[in-house]
């Protein structure tokens, strides 16, 4: 893509010193060493990964940001990727700048992964104009396979058990989040990592 179409950029994330093995691999999976430019032409190959972007370290062209209406006014999670989806659909490109680096990683347990992926599923369900045609399940399966191959390669096969449980919690959270409209309010409050957001929005629903 020509420079004139690059209207959003995000940096490479490097793991912290205390980062666990699987999370360290995930950083490398999502933030490789090579820079890239992504636009609508990449959708057949990359699918939902075309819209991948992180506000942990990102920059935006202000005029395009205002043209597209900026971030959605109210979302539980994933505002950066939702904006990126609208950007790509508008004919612009996203730059992944691997030379720009920031140290950022998590050591989430299974339950934290569940809550986080529930919120991810909700955000995608609320924006079918972006995510219905490009579901995340395929990319998730690809990451699990790559992670399994990696832990075997480094001779730590016992981490396959951790990977199995983490992946299961992630998927169940995501699955429920995508179907949040069918869940009782109490279940939603338990599943989410942002109870305050739901207290406000559930009250609006019931007015």
Model-derived segments and their meaning:
Residues 2-24:
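Conserved donor NDP-sugar-binding/catalytic core segment of glycosyltransferases
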Residues 12, 28-50:
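Short, flexible, basic/aromatic active-site loop/helix in glycosyltransferases
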Residues 40-60, 75-76:
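A recurrent flexible, glycine/aromatic-enriched loop bordering the glycosyltransferase active site
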Residues 59, 63-67, 101:
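Short, well-ordered alpha-helical scaffold segment located
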Residues 76-83:
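Acidic donor-binding loop at a coil-to-helix junction in glycosyltransferase catalytic cores
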Residues 94, 101-173:
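Active-site-adjacent helix/loop segment of glycosyltransferases
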Residues 161-204:
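Membrane-interface aromatic/basic loop that binds lipid-linked glycans or pyrophosphate carriers
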